[in-house]
Amino acid sequence: MAQAFQFELVSPERLLLSAQVTEVVIPGSEGYLTALAGHSPLMTTIMPGVVSVKLADGKTDSYVVFGGFADITPQGCTVLAESATHVDDIDPADIQHRIDHARKVLEDASSNEHRTKAEIFLHQLMTLQGAILPA
C-alpha cells in the first residue's frame, strides 16, 4: 500500500481540501506531474488544468484549477490556486467566458511577448475545456 502524506488545495476564497492522500497529479508549468510521499522538494507554477487526488482511503477526487503554485516536500504538498472548483461544480459558461476573454486579450496584444503568452493561455483553456466538458 502506498504511503500517505498531507495534501492541501487552497484558493483565495477557501480551503477546498485538506486530507491524507497517496497521490496527487498536478498540471505543472512543464506538464503534468505526480506527487507521492517522499517526493523531492519542488516548487512550480501550475497551469489551468485538473488536479487529481487519490485519497488514503482509495477514493479519488478532482478539481479544476486556473493557475497558481504547487509546493511539494517529502512530507506533503500544497497547491495555492488562483481559482479552483470541484470538477462536479464546474460551470461550462465560466470556462467559455474565460476563453472569450483570452481571445480578446490575444487580439489586443501589443507585443510578441504578450501575444505568445495569450496564445499559450488560450490553448491551455481550450485543452481544459475539451478534457472536462462533454463534446
UniProtKB/Swiss-Prot annotation:
SUPFAM superfamilies, alphabetized: Epsilon subunit of F1F0-ATP synthase N-terminal domain
UniProt superkingdom: Bacteria
Key words of the record: ATP synthesis, Cell inner membrane, Cell membrane, CF(1), Hydrogen ion transport, Ion transport, Membrane, Transport
Gene3D superfamilies reported in the protein's UniProt record: F0F1 ATP synthase delta/epsilon subunit, N-terminal
GO cellular component terms attached to this protein's record: plasma membrane; proton-transporting ATP synthase complex
An MF annotation (GO) of this entry: proton-transporting ATP synthase activity, rotational mechanism
Main location: membrane
InterPro entries: ATP_synth_F1_dsu/esu (IPR001469), ATP_synth_F1_dsu/esu_N (IPR020546), ATPsynth_dsu/esu_N (IPR036771)
Membrane topology, as annotated: Peripheral membrane protein
Cellular localisation: Cell inner membrane
Binding partners and assembly: F-type ATPases have 2 components, CF(1) - the catalytic core - and CF(0) - the membrane proton channel. CF(1) has five subunits: alpha(3), beta(3), gamma(1), delta(1), epsilon(1). CF(0) has three main subunits: a, b and c.
Known role: Produces ATP from ADP in the presence of a proton gradient across the membrane.
Family stated for the protein in its record: Belongs to the ATPase epsilon chain family.
Protein name: ATP synthase epsilon chain
